[in-house]
Amino acid sequence: MLNKLTHGVFTYRASLTAMLSSSTSAGLSSSFVSSRFLSSGIFSSGASRNRVTFPVQFHRASAVRCFASSGGSDRIQVQNPIVEMDGDEMTRVIWSMIKEKLILPYLDLDIKYFDLGILNRDATDDKVTVESAEAALKYNVAIKCATITPDEGRVKEFGLKSMWRSPNGTIRNILDGTVFREPIMCSNIPRLVPGWEKPICIGRHAFGDQYRATDTVIKGPGKLKMVFVPEDGNAPVELDVYDFKGPGVALAMYNVDESIRAFAESSMAMALTKKWPLYLSTKNTILKKYDGRFKDIFQEVYEANWKQKFEEHSIWYEHRLIDDMVAYAVKSEGGYVWACKNYDGDVQSDLLAQGFGSLGLMTSVLLSADGKTLESEAAHGTVTRHFRLHQKGQETSTNSIASIFAWTRGLEHRAKLDKNEKLMDFVKKLESSCVNTVETGKMTKDLALLIHGPKVSRDLFLNTEEFIDAVASKLKTQFKELPLV
């Protein structure tokens, strides 16, 4: 079945079962990954905990054309590839289930597979992350499973060679895009802000500011200065910052016009796609030059490239002070795109997630400045606590909705780029199947807790696989004309 193996890339045509087998660590079968962690010994205690030996070449990338064993003609044809980025822990387990039960039975799909599991990132010195992002730029659509960002504890747990950077940060830097988060609305899930009748899509400028700042502890009295030394040989620019009378702290941060402009372009592209108004929030009344630069560049980009397009769809762009925007957000009904600076977006996106109900009901997409390349993923992490239960063979009730929507939002972008109406119809059916499943009372424990309170009984929620099966059943009723594998 293996036709070609060159520099860590292999291509083969496979049945549905073979495809699922290819999408797991070390060439292991999907059943091994989803149900044999406990018995395999891979996750046993000891110095080699969570270490597994595997041939690295099988993890760098694979190009897989997937179709049903009965033939691809009865599946929806997807003309161009998508990049799949596999992940870690409980989300990796449900990722395999989603592919097996909700995606592959319906789509004839060319998948460029990259294993971003922590073990493979370690084995490839994190090159696999860079390669996956470069593939995303090439094929314009990437769908990512949640991944571990290692801290000191994780380095020890997995025996890692290094404390590797966040895969999301690496991918963001290469794609040079903006992260947009948006809630998934279910009518029976209570919202902490009941007035939010429509989604709010929040865009975070994930570059610079506090996240690339230089900070220091000042140990005693003295003058703090900031100096800029031009490369053209002109005289340095020296600014007095503060005359310390005693100990304190200091911070220097920056941003660049190129990144701010890309942020503006991708924010406006998202707003136009959704046909929603766009708001940028800053504190330019205090940071007149720093935040003022954001305000000025957004206005320039809007006037030059977007104003006419926005007006044709009766939408608009507006700058607001961050405090005014937060107040507006709480009292609004939703239905707009909110462009935030880096720190504001970090904070406000979690506020929106809880306000709408749950991080488990939040999508996350990274959109490039030109609007052409999109990477989608769940907004939550790898659900470690549930994975520990899964390792012990105990029942879990893990919410897979955000991971399912990671697939649908990526496939939706593929459908738009390819003008593939059948694929777009599939996306709508799968998303509605998820929402309808919850709205008919079938849900995981985290959502049942929101409805029924902390003493929710076992009969009011489904376990991890039962929920995915319930969604699959809903989807099946919408595709009765298509035989299932």
Swiss-Prot record:
Catalytic activity: D-threo-isocitrate + NADP(+) = 2-oxoglutarate + CO2 + NADPH
Binding site for NADP(+): T147, I148, T149, R154, K331, G381, T382, V383, T384, R385, H386, N399
Entry's EC annotation: 1.1.1.42
Any one annotated GO CC term: mitochondrion
Cellular location(s): Plastid, Chloroplast; Mitochondrion
Site (Critical for catalysis): Y211, K283
Residue numbers binding substrate: T149, S166, P167, N168, G169, T170, I171, R172, R181, R204
PROSITE patterns (alphabetical): IDH_IMDH
Cofactor binding comment, as recorded: Binds 1 Mg(2+) or Mn(2+) ion per subunit.
Domain of life: Eukaryota
Cofactor: Mg(2+); Mn(2+)
Presequence extent in this chain: 1-65
Similarity comment text for this entry: Belongs to the isocitrate and isopropylmalate dehydrogenases family.
Function: May be involved in response to oxidative stresses.
Protein name: Isocitrate dehydrogenase [NADP], chloroplastic/mitochondrial
Organism of origin: Arabidopsis thaliana (Mouse-ear cress)
Lineage of origin: Eukaryota, Viridiplantae, Streptophyta, Embryophyta, Tracheophyta
